[in-house]
């Protein structure tokens, strides 16, 4: 009974299977840095909120100054 593939073809098929298996196992057993990315995202969000609140405070202080000068 003859094999459907030559030895060279079988070697490439086996090599592809091994590489695919290694990448699959690596993706399962490595821990991603999602926690670091989430922390950075939260920090950026906090900074944006702080800047917005500072702008609001500055605007309200200026309005109070203008009102005081007008009175």
Swiss-Prot record:
Keywords: Glycoprotein, Membrane, Transmembrane, Transmembrane helix. The chain crosses the membrane at residues 8-28. Residues 46-55 have a biased composition (Basic residues). Residues 56-71 have a biased composition (Basic and acidic residues). It comes from the Eukaryota. The keyword Plastid does not apply. Residues 31-71 are annotated as: Disordered. Its main location: membrane. The keyword Transmembrane helix applies. GO terms for cellular component: membrane. It is found in: Membrane. Glycans are attached at residue 58. It is a single-pass membrane protein. This is Small integral membrane protein 31. It comes from Homo sapiens. The gene is SMIM31.
